[in-house]
């Protein structure tokens, strides 16, 4: 379901069948699902984006040359990321320019195999950053709110292991700033429903847009426990055209979700 829920063509088919689609519009899914388009949209909305460059070339030789040139402008260390990526697929960290060509070719191959799209972009690798995600809700009446953050910095192979709310290092001022940025991100694509805006929080205190998940996520109960908001219920109300029933953000208590991973030895 997670894969289908973020496919714009699936949402379109559901709507064309005369059914109610519980989620954002196909247009919003498409804009946020393509990472390069999302970065460009966020820049236009005034949401801070990780320094980097998008490369639209699809021809392999031209793309690799464009990526090579972009790497000199972005600087090292850097991340190569698939525009249609997720779950760490098509992602490579590069610390030495001598390793760039091999990493870029490998990232493209993996992206094509996983997503059928070999487009790669470059981001500056922000070492020591925390991974913070903001839960948002938006109804069809024009109201968009955030429900605070979840910290998911502890990861294994680019997959989250711990989800914690509220974030242990978060301040009220930073929560408000990140929350307002998440709301701006949602409004930039006319978002409706439940979604998650992910940010990197640098050691300097600066934060940068990473991506938006255009669906409810498995970690949503963490937020429900500390806010008292039933996100699934709100999502269904929104899909029916009703206004959200939740009031101002009030955090109470602490919640942690832990994922178990089964791996080959």
Q: Would you name each region that the model predicts?
A:
Residues 217-230:
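ATP-dependent carboxylate-activation loops
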Residues 1-197, 201-220:
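N-terminal beta-alpha lobe that positions the nucleotide/phosphoryl donor
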Residues 49-53, 193-195, 233, 242-249:
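Acidic/polar loop patches that form or flank catalytic/metal-binding clefts of enzymes
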Residues 126, 226, 238-239:
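Hydrophobic residues in alpha-helical segments
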Residues 12, 149, 224, 233-237:
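Generic alpha-helical structural context detector
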Residues 65-67, 234-265:
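Peripheral (often C-terminal) accessory segments that flank ATP-dependent C-N-forming ligase machineries
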């Amino acid at each position: 379901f997670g894969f289908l829920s973020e496919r714009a063509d699936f949402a379109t088919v559901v709507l064309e069948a005369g059914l109610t689609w519980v989620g954002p519009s196909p247009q919003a899914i498409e804009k946020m699902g393509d990472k390069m388009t999302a970065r460009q949209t966020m820049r236009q909305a005034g949401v801070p984006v990780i320094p980097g460059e998008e490369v639209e070339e699809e021809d392999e030789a031209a793309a690799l040359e464009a990526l090579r040139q972009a790497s000199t402008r972005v600087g090292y260390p850097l991340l190569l990321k698939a525009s249609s990526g997720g779950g760490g697929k098509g992602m490579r960290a590069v610390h030495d320019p001598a390793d760039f060509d091999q990493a870029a070719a490998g990232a493209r191959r993996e992206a094509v195999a996983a997503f059928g799209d070999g487009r790669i972009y470059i981001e500056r690798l922000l070492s020591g950053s925390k991974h913070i995600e903001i839960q948002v809700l938006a109804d069809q009446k024009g109201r968009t709110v955030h429900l605070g953050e979840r910290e998911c910095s502890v990861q294994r192979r680019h997959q989250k292991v711990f989800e914690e709310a509220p974030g242990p290092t978060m301040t009220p001022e930073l929560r408000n700033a990140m929350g307002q940025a998440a709301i701006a991100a949602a409004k930039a694509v006319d978002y409706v429903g439940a979604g998650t805006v992910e940010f990197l929080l640098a050691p300097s205190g600066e934060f940068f847009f990473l991506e938006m998940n255009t669906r409810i996520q498995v970690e949503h109960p963490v937020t429900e426990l500390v806010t008292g908001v039933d996100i699934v219920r709100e999502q269904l109300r929104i899909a029916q055209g009703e206004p959200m029933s939740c009031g101002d953000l009030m955090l109470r208590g602490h919640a942690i979700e832990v994922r178990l991973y089964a791996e080959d030895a």
